[in-house]
Structure formats: structure tokens, C-alpha cells
């Protein structure tokens, strides 16, 4: 009986079999906890679903964890800045509408 996805295919996606086991376990836990899936699945079990995601390349290991943390920090800061700019524009629009309403 051939397992799908095959171990050889999966080992092409990660640096070692130990990394594969850790990545698969973490992703399976995330899926069980309700994390959104990155694709449709053939399998019912979360462990096999995690392996399908690894095989497709949708889930990967970050070999530079500090770099990942920095990227997440930058993304959060960028989102915060965008929200602040949007709130500022909304407040300016409200103030302008009030001004226009008082002129009439």
C-alpha cells in the first residue's frame, strides 16, 4: 500500500525527516484548533491534511525564525499604520461634512 503523499515527495519540501514530523504535528494541531485550510483536502484526518498542505508547498518551515518574527512585526505595524490613516481620513471627511452642513 502506497501512502499519499509519499515520504520522498515530502522530504523534498523540508530539510529533514525530523523537521517534517514537527511541521506536520504543528500544522495538524492548528487545523484541529480551527485554523483556516489553505486548500481542499482528500483526507479526513488532520495529520494527513497537514501532509497534503506540506506536499503542495502551502505550509513551509521558516529556517530563520527571527526573520519571520521581524516580518510579522513589520506586517502588524503596516496594518496599524493603514488603519490609523483610514481613521484620520474618516474623521476629516466627517469634519468636512459638518462644515458643509453648517454653511447651508
Swiss-Prot record:
Family the UniProt entry places it in: Belongs to the RNA polymerase subunit omega family.
GO BP of this protein: DNA-templated transcription
Task of the protein: Promotes RNA polymerase assembly. Latches the N- and C-terminal regions of the beta' subunit thereby facilitating its interaction with the beta and alpha subunits.
Known catalytic reactions: RNA(n) + a ribonucleoside 5'-triphosphate = RNA(n+1) + diphosphate
Disulfide bond sites: none
Enzyme class: transferase
One Gene Ontology MF term: DNA binding
The enzyme's E.C. designation: 2.7.7.6
Keyword set, alphabetical order: DNA-directed RNA polymerase, Nucleotidyltransferase, Transcription, Transferase
Region span, Disordered: 76-104
GO cellular component: DNA-directed RNA polymerase complex
SMART domains with a match to the protein in the record: RNA_pol_Rpb6
Protein name, entry field: DNA-directed RNA polymerase subunit omega
Amino acid at each position: 500500500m502506497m501512502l499519499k503523499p509519499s515520504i520522498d515527495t515530502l522530504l523534498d519540501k523540508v530539510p529533514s525527516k525530523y523537521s517534517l514530523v514537527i511541521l506536520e504535528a504543528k500544522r495538524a494541531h492548528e487545523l484541529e484548533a480551527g485554523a483556516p485550510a489553505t486548500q481542499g483536502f482528500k483526507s479526513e484526518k488532520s495529520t494527513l491534511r497537514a501532509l497534503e498542505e506540506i506536499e503542495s508547498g502551502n505550509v513551509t518551515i521558516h529556517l530563520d525564525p527571527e526573520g519571520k518574527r521581524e516580518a510579522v512585526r513589520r506586517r502588524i505595524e503596516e496594518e496599524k499604520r493603514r488603519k490609523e490613516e483610514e481613521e484620520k481620513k474618516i474623521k476629516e471627511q466627517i469634519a468636512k461634512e459638518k462644515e458643509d452642513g453648517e454653511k447651508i
